[in-house]
Regions:
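Active-site bordering "gate/hinge" segments
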Residues: 2-450
Length: 450
């Protein structure tokens, strides 16, 4: 197994531009000025004006979800759900229990799908040297894999992956990997050949598993991407009440859940053990989460993941106040400098030019109580951990113990990567629990979904 090493340090001075940044679905350019290997100035440039706010003006609010979820082809459902919740908040409608269960089940599978895709297909090449896998010993790789996972591993399976990889490299048709600087021995790669072979094999397997998660979403959501089952006041998928449809969802869920626990989490720990120095980079100071998985859509505090904020890397979760969220456009390609609450926002495009260091992005800058805050898995896991979530705390403690880390190490690139896996594991377990509760509620005779 690979040993932890120290990240090579650069003394470069000059500009660095990454365009496009390929770790997201969207159009993002990063510009940084570097002095002696340290970033002295940075700009995040949203290069595409989507104009969703402009498109929605004058439209029936019941249709909004179908536009907003086109923001992304991966995390589609979350935008539809947010739009539907906004409408429900405006008209003060009550949501049936079954509808809340179904929404949460689809959301659970959305999380599992997204995090598997991110770890393997968007992030893996930051730490996995694919070509190094060709030098691996498949027998040794199988032994390593079996030692960290309850799922048996086969040397023949790893040999087959090597053969497929060898044919791919020798074909010369490398597609997006053509002229890739990171292939073939970059000094920032720490994994040994066997770990690289394991990760490459699971990269390929995850391509099939993410389809299973997407299919599970479509069982209740009608399609994926871009679900078609939400309405203000509930859901429209009456078939979701039938034993056949529930069993189909459950079968797909179990396959994805097994992959999470038997493949993703062991891979995360294998990688994390080699990249301990990632605890020294990528840290931010402030975090915010709305929480998620409500018992009652009208009550933020009913959410299983509680809302909260963390400031200045202190291991303390503070109360969340949505009224403290504001949008700034001072450095964006929009008219004016005024600060607005999101529900009072103004979207009046005013492009200058690329390279302008004063106004340089189509993205607005949201702030919480005047501070830039990180959202996402690390924020949600931090708040849940610090608030004593009974399901989250033992998983966080186990990961920290396995990697010989402290809670303070979570404020880092490695902490963020670990948090995504932790969030996946606990949501996978919670989704199974919600599914059982839903089945029992339907069996009791409750058939109301809207």
């Amino acid at each position: 197994m690979s040993e932890a090493r120290k990240t090579p340090q650069s003394h470069f001075t000059g500009p660095v531009v990454i365009d496009p940044l390929t770790r997201i679905e969207g159009h993002l350019r990063i510009e940084v000025e570097v002095k002696d290997g340290r970033v002295s100035e940075a700009r995040s440039v949203g290069t595409l004006y989507r104009g969703l706010e402009t498109i929605l003006v004058g439209r029936d609010p019941r249709d909004v979800q179908h536009f907003t979820q086109r923001t992304c082809g991966v995390c589609t459902y979350t935008h539809a759900l947010a739009s539907t919740r906004a409408l429900e908040d405006a008209i003060k409608v009550e949501i049936p229990k079954n509808a809340t269960y179904i929404r949460n089940l689809v959301l659970g599978m959305q999380y599992l799908h997204d995090h598997i895709v991110h770890f393997y297909h968007l992030h893996a090449l930051d730490f996995v040297d694919v070509t190094s896998a060709l030098q691996a010993d498949p027998v040794k790789a199988a032994k390593i894999c079996s030692s960290v996972s309850p799922r048996p591993a086969s040397a023949d399976g790893f040999k087959a992956v090597q053969a497929k990889l060898k044919a791919f490299v020798e074909s010369g048709q490398l597609g997006p990997f053509t002229n890739a600087y990171f292939l073939g021995g970059h000094p920032a790669y720490y994994l040994d050949p066997e770990a690289n072979l394991i990760a490459t094999a699971h990269y390929l397997e995850a391509l099939r598993l993410q389809v299973k998660a997407a299919r599970a979403m479509a069982v209740f959501g009608a399609k994926n991407p871009h679900t078609q089952f939400l309405v203000a006041g509930g859901v429209t998928c009456y078939e979701s009440l039938t034993p056949e449809r529930i069993a189909e969802f459950e079968g797909l869920y179990k396959e994805v859940n097994d992959f999470v626990n038997q493949v993703y989490i062991p891979d995360l720990l294998l990688v994390g053990g080699a990249y301990k120095d990632w605890t020294k980079i990528g840290g931010t100071a402030n975090f915010m989460t709305f929480g998620e998985f409500p018992g009652d859509e009208r009550n933020l505090e009913s959410r299983w993941f509680k809302p909260g904020v963390v400031f200045d890397r202190k291991l303390e979760a503070l109360p969340f106040d949505p009224s403290k969220i504001e949008e700034h456009v001072r450095h964006s390609w929009y008219a004016g400098d005024a600060v607005h609450k999101p529900f009072q926002g103004v979207t009046e495009p005013k492009f200058t030019f690329m390279g302008d260091k004063d106004r340089y992005s189509w993205m607005k800058a949201p702030r919480y109580d005047g501070r830039a805050v990180e959202t996402g898995p690390l924020a949600q896991v931090l708040v849940a951990y610090l608030k004593g979530n009974a399901e989250v705390v033992p998983v966080v403690d186990s990961v920290l113990q396995t990697l010989s880390l402290t809670p303070g190490d979570l404020f880092s690139t490695l902490g963020r990567t670990a948090a995504r896996g932790i969030e996946t594991a606990v949501i996978a377990k919670k989704t199974g629990e919600m599914l059982q509760e839903y089945k029992e509620n339907v069996a009791s005779g409750d058939k109301k979904i809207v």
